[in-house]
């Protein structure tokens, strides 16, 4: 059974996570960081940085809409996006085509699990019967 967290809190926590991931993606031109973590180095870094910019925008929307009208619709969209992202990470990990080491694999499995949990929490809040 999923935790019973208020929808407002789920959106605010997710906004903080999105902003944190955005900061990491902004550093995608720093190859040594990705190599240290055993993660694939984004080439070109521009795409990862663009994703970081999009995540900043999403974090702002999540923070501002928390506890307000439109919260359920945002939660639904975030649930779908998080589920898709988790699925993509798992597919890539299972394909064995990612240039990662043991540390990188562990990090990506954790991220996939976190995204799946996030998707479930947002889905429960987004499709809850009033």
Regions found by a protein language model. Name each.
Residues 113-130:
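Membrane-water interface at the C-terminal end of transmembrane alpha helices
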Residues 39, 60-73, 93-97:
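Juxtamembrane helix-break-helix junctions at the cytosolic face
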Residues 80, 102-116:
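Individual transmembrane alpha-helices with interfacial aromatic-anchor signatures
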Residues 1-18:
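Cytosolic juxtamembrane helix and N-cap/initiation of the first transmembrane helix
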Residues 16-27, 43-67, 79-87, 113:
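Core segments of alpha-helical transmembrane spans in multipass integral membrane proteins
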Residues 31-42, 96-102:
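Membrane-interface helix termini and inter-helical loops of multi-pass transporters
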Residues 23-36, 88-93:
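Membrane-embedded alpha-helical segments in integral membrane proteins
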Residues 87-107, 124-128:
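Membrane-helix boundary connector in multi-pass membrane proteins
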């Amino acid at each position: 059974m999923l935790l019973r967290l208020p929808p407002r809190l789920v959106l605010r926590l997710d906004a903080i996570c999105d902003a944190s991931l955005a900061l990491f993606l902004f550093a995608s031109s720093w190859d040594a960081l990705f190599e240290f973590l055993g993660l694939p180095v984004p080439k070109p870094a521009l795409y990862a940085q663009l994703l970081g910019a999009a995540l900043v925008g999403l974090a702002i929307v999540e923070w501002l809409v928390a506890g307000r009208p439109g919260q359920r619709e945002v939660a639904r969209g975030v649930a779908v996006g998080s589920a898709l992202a988790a699925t993509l990470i798992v597919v890539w990990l299972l394909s064995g085509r990612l240039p990662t080491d043991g540390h990188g694999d562990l990090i990506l499995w954790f991220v996939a699990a976190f995204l799946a949990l996030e998707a479930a929490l947002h889905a429960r809040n987004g499709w809850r019967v009033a």
